[in-house]
C-alpha cells in the first residue's frame, strides 16, 4: 500500500523568490558604488570630525588690525605672523607686521628687548621690499623701522648715523615711487628731526597733515617734532588728536603725560607745579585703566607714575608703583634699578642696596624678594623667589652703577676689612665723575 508523505503543518517548503534576489543584487551593486565614491572622495564616511575652514591671510590681518586698535600689540604681532605664514609672499602683510613690531618696542622696558624687537621689524620690512621692490608703502615702513633703530642706547654714534642715513634714503625712495604717500612724508619728517634738521622736518610734517590728518602716525610725529622744539603744550594737543584716532594705544598717553611732566619741571616751586603733575598722572592713570580693561600687564604706565611721584618727592607711592611693575615682570633687572633709585632718593640707603644689586649683579632666592622691597619671600602671597640676571652697563643705565657704588662706599658695606673689599669700594667711587651727582639728582 502506498502512503503519501504528510504535509508540514507549521513550516513552508523553502523556495526561491526572484524579487528577493533582485533586491540583493541591487544592494551589492549599491555598496560597490559607494565604496568607489568614498575612495574618490565624492562621499565622506559618517562620524568624521567637522571640517575646520582654513583661515585666509586677510582674516589674520583683520585680527591683527583689531588687536592693534585695542592696544594688544603682542596679539597683533602674533596674528600678522600667522598671516605671513599662510601667505609668505604678501609684501603688504610683511610691511604692516614691521610697523606693529616697531611700535611695540615702545612698550618694552629693557634695551636688549627693544633692540631685538626693532631688529625683527627691520627683517620684516626687508622681506616686504624683497617681495615688492617698487612698493612705496614697504619703503616707508622700512624708513620708520630704521629710524627707531637709530638709538644711542643700542649702538655707537657712527652706527646711529648709518641707520639715519639709510632711513632717509628709504623715505626718499618711498616718495619717489609715490609722492602722495602721506606716511612716507611723516616718517621722513621723523628721520629729519632725529638728524636735527628741524625746519625741514616741520615743513614735511605739515605737508603730511595737509594731505591726510586722519592718520595716528602723522599726529604722533607732529607731536614729536613739537616736543623736540620745546613746544610742549602744542605737542600735547597733537598727542590728544592721535589718541582720538587710536584711543587704546597707551604709548600715546605716556608721551602726553611725559610732556606735562616736562612742563612741570619748568615751574620752580613744586607745590605750584602740582596741578601740572596731576595732569600728567591723569594720562598715566588712563593708560593703566586701558591695560586693565584689555588684560595687558604692561609695567610702563606704573613706571611713569613712579617717576612723576618721585619728582613730587612722594617716594612711598612712587616705590609702590615700581613694585607693581615688578609684579608684572619680576625678573626685569632694569625695574629693580628704578626701585633702587627711588629708595636712594628717599634715603632708604639699605633698601637701595638690595634693589641695585639685583639690577647690576643679578640675584636669586631670598635676595630677589629683598630686592623687591620685601623682608623675605612670601610664597603664600605670591611673592616667590626668582632668578634675576644683572644688566650690562650702558649709557642710560650708568646711574645704577654710580649710585650702587656710592652707597656701598658711604655705608662701608664690606663685611670684612680685606684689602680686596676696600679696593673694590675705591674702584666704584673712582669709576664715575663728580659731575654725575647733579645730573642724577633730578
Where are the regions that the model predicts?
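Residue-level recognition of tetratricopeptide repeat
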Residues: 65, 99, 103-106, 144, ...
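TPR-repeat structural position
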Residues: 73-74, 107, 111, 118, ...
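Single-residue signature of alpha-solenoid repeat helices
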Residues: 76, 114, 121, 160, ...
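Structural marker of alpha-solenoid helical repeat scaffolds
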Residues: 86, 131, 177, 211, ...
Amino acid at each position: 500500500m502506498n502512503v503519501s508523505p504528510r504535509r508540514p503543518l507549521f513550516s513552508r517548503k523553502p523556495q526561491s523568490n526572484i524579487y528577493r534576489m533582485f533586491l540583493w543584487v541591487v544592494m551589492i551593486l549599491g555598496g560597490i558604488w559607494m565604496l568607489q565614491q568614498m575612495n574618490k572622495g565624492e562621499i565622506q564616511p559618517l562620524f568624521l570630525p567637522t571640517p575646520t575652514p582654513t583661515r585666509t591671510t586677510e582674516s589674520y590681518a583683520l585680527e591683527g588690525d583689531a588687536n592693534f586698535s585695542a592696544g594688544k600689540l603682542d596679539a597683533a604681532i602674533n596674528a600678522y605672523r600667522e598671516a605671513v605664514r599662510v601667505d609668505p609672499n604678501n609684501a603688504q602683510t610683511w610691511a604692516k607686521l614691521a610697523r606693529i613690531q616697531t611700535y611695540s618696542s615702545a612698550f618694552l622696558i629693557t634695551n636688549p628687548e627693544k633692540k631685538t624687537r626693532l631688529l625683527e621689524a627691520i627683517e620684516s620690512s626687508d622681506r616686504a621690499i624683497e617681495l615688492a621692490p617698487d612698493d612705496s608703502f614697504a619703503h616707508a615702513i622700512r624708513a620708520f623701522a630704521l629710524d627707531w633703530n637709530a638709538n644711542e642706547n643700542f649702538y655707537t654714534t657712527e652706527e646711529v648715523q648709518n641707520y639715519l642715513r639709510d632711513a632717509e634714503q628709504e623715505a626718499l625712495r618711498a616718495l619717489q615711487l609715490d609722492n602722495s604717500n602721506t606716511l612716507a612724508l611723516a616718517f621722513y619728517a621723523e628721520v629729519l628731526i632725529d638728524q636735527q634738521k628741524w625746519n625741514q622736518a616741520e615743513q614735511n610734517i605739515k605737508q603730511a597733515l595737509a594731505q591726510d590728518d586722519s592718520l595716528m602716525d602723522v599726529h604722533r610725529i607732529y607731536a614729536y617734532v613739537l616736543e623736540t622744539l620745546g613746544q610742549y603744550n602744542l605737542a600735547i594737543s597733537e598727542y590728544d588728536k592721535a589718541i582720538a584716532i587710536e584711543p587704546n594705544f597707551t604709548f600715546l598717553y605716556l608721551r602726553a603725560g611725559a610732556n606735562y611732566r616736562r612742563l612741570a619741571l619748568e615751574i620752580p616751586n613744586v607745590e605750584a607745579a602740582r596741578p601740572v603733575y596731576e595732569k600728567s598722572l591723569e594720562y598715566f592713570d588712563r593708560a593703566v585703566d586701558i591695560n586693565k580693561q584689555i588684560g595687558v600687564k604692561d609695567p610702563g604706565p606704573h613706571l611713569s607714575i613712579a617717576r612723576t611721584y618721585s619728582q613730587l618727592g612722594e617716594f612711598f607711592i612712587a616705590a609702590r608703583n615700581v613694585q607693581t611693575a615688578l609684579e608684572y615682570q619680576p625678573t626685569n633687572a632694569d625695574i629693580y634699578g628704578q626701585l633702587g633709585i627711588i629708595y636712594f632718593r628717599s634715603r632708604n640707603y639699605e633698601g637701595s642696596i638690595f634693589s641695585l644689586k639685583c639690577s647690576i649683579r643679578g640675584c636669586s632666592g631670598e635676595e630677589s624678594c629683598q630686592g623687591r622691597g620685601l623682608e623675605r619671600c612670601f610664597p603664600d602671597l605670591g611673592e616667590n623667589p626668582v632668578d634675576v640676571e644683572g644688566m650690562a652697563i650702558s649709557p642710560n643705565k650708568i646711574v645704577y652703577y654710580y649710585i650702587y657704588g656710592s652707597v656701598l662706599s658711604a655705608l662701608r658695606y664690606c663685611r670684612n676689612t680685606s684689602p680686596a673689599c676696600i679696593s673694590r669700594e675705591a674702584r666704584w667711587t673712582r669709576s664715575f665723575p663728580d659731575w654725575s651727582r647733579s645730573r642724577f639728582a633730578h
